[in-house]
């Protein structure tokens, strides 16, 4: 990861105010990085704080999946996602998929304000970082070979 990180900012409706406050508090640090956000969250950050944000679709309309695709393509380095654990979301499966893809590609993820505070204040946030990446492609190839050779059934 370069010194300038590409940070995705997402918040469920009941957590948007929290994210807005957090971003406002960390404006100095965040302004040094490239910011991405899902639709409504991005609009709020632009309107209320005057931030330059690359806006994607709203979460329920595919924005979470767009962020996930960007993670898989190596175009997002950090995910800050203030989600609402008490409110069921129409796109809960997208949220789970997003967290899973962030884990597969080993990017830092904060889903609570405390974790976001620790993450943003890390010296690594403003420095070059060489992340360790598990090669899941190799594991997939191994599983495919076993299925083809009849050693185990596909799951």
Swiss-Prot record:
EC number(s) on file: 4.2.3.3
Keywords: Lyase
Gene3D superfamilies (alphabetical): Methylglyoxal synthase-like domain (3.40.50.1380)
Binding site for substrate: 12, 16, 38-41, 58-59, 91
PROSITE patterns xrefs: METHYLGLYOXAL_SYNTH (PS01335), MGS (PS51855)
Main enzyme class: lyase
Ranges of residues in domain MGS-like: 1-155
Entry annotation: catalytic residues: 64
Gene Ontology BP terms: methylglyoxal biosynthetic process
GO cellular component, one term: cytosol
InterPro entries documented for this protein: Methylgl_synth (IPR004363), Methylglyoxal_synth_AS (IPR018148), MGS-like_dom (IPR011607), MGS-like_dom_sf (IPR036914)
Catalysed reactions listed for this entry: dihydroxyacetone phosphate = methylglyoxal + phosphate
Domain of life of the native organism: Bacteria
Pfam families: MGS
MF terms in GO: methylglyoxal synthase activity
Family: Belongs to the methylglyoxal synthase family.
Function: Catalyzes the formation of methylglyoxal from dihydroxyacetone phosphate.
PANTHER family: METHYLGLYOXAL SYNTHASE
Name this protein carries in UniProt: Methylglyoxal synthase
Organism in which the protein naturally occurs: Thermotoga maritima (strain ATCC 43589 / DSM 3109 / JCM 10099 / NBRC 100826 / MSB8)
The gene coding this protein: mgsA
